[in-house]
Amino acid sequence: MSNQPKKYETQNIANSTEESDAFDIVTIPVPSEEPQESDQTEEHESGIEQFSESHAIHVEEQSDRSFSSLEPDSEQLMKEVISPRQVSYTPQHHEKQYAMQSPNDDSLAFLDKIKAIKESLQESMEDSLATVKVVLIPVGQEIVISFKVDTVLKYLKDYFSHLLGIPLSVLQIRYSGKILRNNETLVQHGVKPQEIIQVEIFSTNPDLYPVKRIDGLTDVSQIITVTVQTGLDRYQQVAVEIVKSDFHKPFLGGFRHKVTGVEYHHAGTQTVPKKIPERLSVFCRDTQTVFQKKNLQQTTNTTSTQMTNIGVYVSNMTDKLVTPGKYFSAAEYHAQRLKAVIVIQTYYRQWHAKIFVEDLRRQKSLRLEWETQQELRKIREKEEWVKLDYHRRHNPKTSEDFEFLYNALEFWRQEELKRINQSFTGAERKAALCELLEKETQIIASIGRHRYIAYTANQEAAIQAFLDKCSAPKIWRTPNGKTIEMDTQFTIRARELQNIYKCIMLKNISQDERLDVLLTLKHTVKEHECKLTQEILELIDREVDLMMRGVKHHNLEGLRKRIATLFFHYIKTPLFNPEVAKYLKVPQDPLKFYKKIYFCHSCQLYLPSTEFSISSTSRRIYRCRNCISLENEAQKRESFLKYRCLLQQLYFTEADYEDDSKIAFLMQLQDIQYLTENIWASQSVLSAWDDLSDLVMVRWNKSLEWSPWNCILLTKDEAAAHLNLTSIEEGYERSFIHKIKHKHILAKNYFSQIPVLASFILDDPEIDEIRWKHHSDTTPKIIESQRPPP
């Protein structure tokens, strides 16, 4: 027996139970190394001892990166050949028996038979093994084991279920992109014995049962014996340590054999890198305390001087004679420096003065240029306003334009009336007044003709806008700024009717094209039978008949206009065009319309609420917009265009502040007119400028929101200067401030009638103080009668 110690490495993978054959195969045993013996008898004794202990089974397996050995379950087969008595020999008993018996042929034959059976069992078990490289997904850890190709994969899954701590039903094995079932074997998928394959194990529920790394498999090693040929007939057994690690081998280069195709890597690729030792935590006083040490050190500087001496010649051709200069004292030195400083200061101040003057000159030129541009801008705006006024007079289109024309007519009539009253008397005056009345009548008739033309054009534009609104697709705006459009069956129907209406309204088309349009219209209208559709069909047949008889186009204008009008009524019917129901002024449900109509005492008509103009202070509804406009054209002939511009500019100014102001947007046209005329006298409070086109209404205190009691009427330039003030008390005199506050109190008294604005006024402490100061005691007095005592 050899006394050499056996080398064992710590086994990190837990062995499975001996009850299952597959688990014995998966088990990775502790490798052992057998010492070599020269004596043949001792070699057989060692074989018997190792066989009785059933620990040494050599399985040599080769892989690209790691090797593993699995212990075959040969114990049961060996028991059939050898009895328990023969297997349970101790080393001492065996030595005594060997000393008593002499070696003979029977014992040697028996040992050879045992060894042959053992080798045959090992070969039969090794032939059915395959090297399986298991990759854990998603951690990427690689584990190399040996597994029988004819064993069901349920045992492999049970093994890794025990290692990973994951239920068996959650784990899945994948090979070549296919999921392997529990009752399948590797042979069924074409895996042969002694073959190297790679499978992947992953979890079907990674959130609840994630696959993690197995830390116990990082340093598993094995020692095997390899026979190496050292000479012609010489062989030597070398112990090789195989380190199994999940370290991913990097490719650092190599070479490939052209004949055999074997790829050889460098040593750095085949060696696991050494671990960097972790730095120990140091928390002692030396690492947290700073010690300073200060030492002064003067280095030596060796110098030498060359001079003439015996045997040394130094040339003096380049030498020069230095004579001492004039000596001056410290006072003279400082006086000279002071003189130089004065010179520098003089030139610097001169340069600074030039720069300052040039800067002032440049600012002045910029200011003059800016003022010139502002004057030109004002002149340009004035000219544009005059051009717009002229265009409105000659091409009126909107109600504001006709309102402006009637205002100009009234202004002209007042001037002519004043001139006639000053120039004529008696019969001449009456004749001049009659002539003035006749001219006024002609002008009113001309304005009426322009109004009819504008009404016709506006009516066509309104119809087209109405049809565009009905046929428009549904639009949504996404958070990223893009728009989404969707067409419904109702919008598609509305678009088809709109296209037919446009074709009907086309002019200067041929007779065949007109017949095609009428035929399309006829097929569209035939879908519904009612009185309106029957009338449209009759008119279509009449036009076709007249066209076949050769009637000219200008004689068919009335008929075509009637067809277009009836077809527009067809489009406005919700039964034929469901999309139009959303845009009709008169709703289909009478109950909804009942609460929104009012009676006009002037035209005696019931109209919707949108046809009435209501001011902020009005409490009842008397006349509609048309009656008020008609009364203005007949009597006052006032123009509210400038007040509209003033109110619109106020809206824009308050919107730019972005401070959630509310009162300014509650103001109506009548309110801004009253505020301008009655409170501010239609002129600037600073310069008394009375042209409303140049006036704006801004905040008095810009830190508070605009209101009738926090505003001031100024020109545009004055408003810009007012808004630049940091303090009102510093910018204006006390008398002017008192005057403005008085106007604010007048505005509060007027607009306090509005319930919405009254809620803002009641919260003002200043108005409460004024009311308390002028409050009179109205409590009833109690007079007690005093009777004389009896």
UniProtKB/Swiss-Prot annotation:
GO CC annotation: 9+2 motile cilium; acrosomal vesicle; radial spoke; sperm flagellum
InterPro entries: IQUB, Ubiquitin-like_dom, Ubiquitin-like_domsf
Disulfide bond entries: none
Any one of the GO BP annotations: cilium assembly
Entries under Pfam families matching the protein: ubiquitin (PF00240)
Ranges of biased composition (kind: Polar residues): 1-17
Span list, region Disordered: 1-49
Keywords per UniProt: Cell projection, Cilium, Cilium biogenesis/degradation, Cytoplasm, Cytoskeleton, Flagellum
Role of this protein: Adapter protein that anchors the radial spoke 1 (RS1) complex to the A microtubule of outer doublet microtubules in axonemes. The triple radial spokes (RS1, RS2 and RS3) are required to modulate beating of the sperm flagellum. May play a role in inhibiting signaling via MAPK1/ERK2 and MAPK3/ERK1. Additionally, may play a role in the functioning of cilia. Not required for the functioning of tracheal or ependymal cilia.
Protein name per UniProt: IQ motif and ubiquitin-like domain-containing protein
Taxonomic source organism: Macaca fascicularis (Crab-eating macaque)
